[in-house]
Amino acid sequence: MSKISEVVQRARAAFNSGKTRPLQFRIQQLEALRRMIKEHEKDLAGALTADLHKNEWNAYYEEVVYVLEEIEYMIKKLPEWAADEPVEKTPQTQQDECYIHSEPLGVVLIIGTWNYPFTVTIQPMVGAIAAGNAVVIKPSELSENMANLLATIIPQYLDRDLYPVISGGIPETTELLKERFDHILYTGNTAVGKVIMMAAAKHLTPVTLELGGKNPCYVDKDCDLDIACRRIAWGKFMNSGQTCVAPDYILCDPSIQNQIVEKLKKALKEFYGEDAKKSRDYGRIINSRHFQRVMGLMEGQKVAYGGTGDAATRYIAPTILIDVDTQSQVMQEEIFGPVMPIVCVRSLEEAIQFINQREKPLALYVFSLNDKMIKKMIAETSSGGVTANDVIVHVSVHSLPYGGVGNSGMGSYHGKKSFETFSHCRSCLVRPLLNDESLKTRYPPSLAKMTRH
């Protein structure tokens, strides 16, 4: 038996012992996780700085705070969510007790990713712990400083058998996927998501896949362009564009393209100064391979702003592309970098058609003062989530499920949805062992009963 198999088997044995069943145990583990985060805030920030050039402020407000809020929300709501839920009865079951009982699935595997290596690894773990599962954590090896830190500190605070951390790269993940889990949650790209799903199918293991896509951002002529562009620039260029729900490209009328460029430039200079490379708030690309990939997407494009990079530091300047050919590579794959293409459309209907001709995105954004236009965009398109007149913030609302649709993923989590994702809703009926006379019509022989109808 391999070391990874031993770790998974220990987690299953610990789960089978029943120790996760009591709510008090789950809450104690969540409280320990909260304590771990608060006592290691500086270490977490240091790892994020080393991996992605995030400063302490960005590390806290882009990652740590969301997990702390999720833990508080879970602890507060867990007794309510875990309680048996009575359901409506049929005429034949009026004397019975009918309810839904939430039970843990078993051993859950969470495979994190590198762009928000703390949040996307630990936030789903919060829900899995709350639901009473054992959780095997596999951080991304690309954000190696965060991966090493989590492998060090998690065993110091949480039950070591129930919540192990597996370090390593593709070989270790491949070995993990040979094991039988009761649920797998993966965050990453669509190609790997398909590999995860194929591996899970061998054991009929359900999956939650948080993938990606090209998130459209439609800007109506009838809106405050200063506010719109400031909000778009914030969401697009935070973490150097390496955010799965960042706006990937802008759709707008040709008449406002130049205004959008100028207002984006103004916002970028406000955020990061004349030279973003010198800004403590501006991130870096995770590694050289991704640096080369993003730089390659700009080849042959009309650059209105930025377009430069430094391979030695993996810095790519905030970049705006105009008059973009929709058949070019930059419009065929998720950019996942600080490059914003602008595509011109002449109407809302054309924008909707453009969006619907492509794979369903993880997020969709629309800026307009016209509520009917916003409702039309929502009604006639499909995406994992929507924010109108801002970007990204729907992900921060614990009561809204976070997930994709189609090529951008399946399943969702956050808040109550996390508890539901990592629970089995068990249908329960408890009948009194009395008054069998009322059930006599169901018993054979049936011939005499049939002649009466």
Curated annotation (Swiss-Prot):
GO BP annotations, alphabetical order: aldehyde metabolic process; lipid metabolic process
Gene3D superfamilies: Aldehyde Dehydrogenase, Chain A, domain 1 (3.40.605.10), Aldehyde Dehydrogenase, Chain A, domain 2 (3.40.309.10)
Enzyme Commission numbers on file: 1.2.1.5
Pfam families linked to this entry: Aldedh (PF00171)
Residues bearing PTM N6-acetyllysine: K178, K194
GO molecular function: aldehyde dehydrogenase (NAD+) activity
Residues reported to bind NAD(+): G188, N189, T190, A191, V192, G193
PANTHER family: ALDEHYDE DEHYDROGENASE (PTHR43570), ALDEHYDE DEHYDROGENASE, DIMERIC NADP-PREFERRING (PTHR43570:SF15)
Protein name per Swiss-Prot or TrEMBL: Aldehyde dehydrogenase, dimeric NADP-preferring
Organism per entry: Canis lupus familiaris (Dog)
Gene transcribed to yield this protein: ALDH3A1
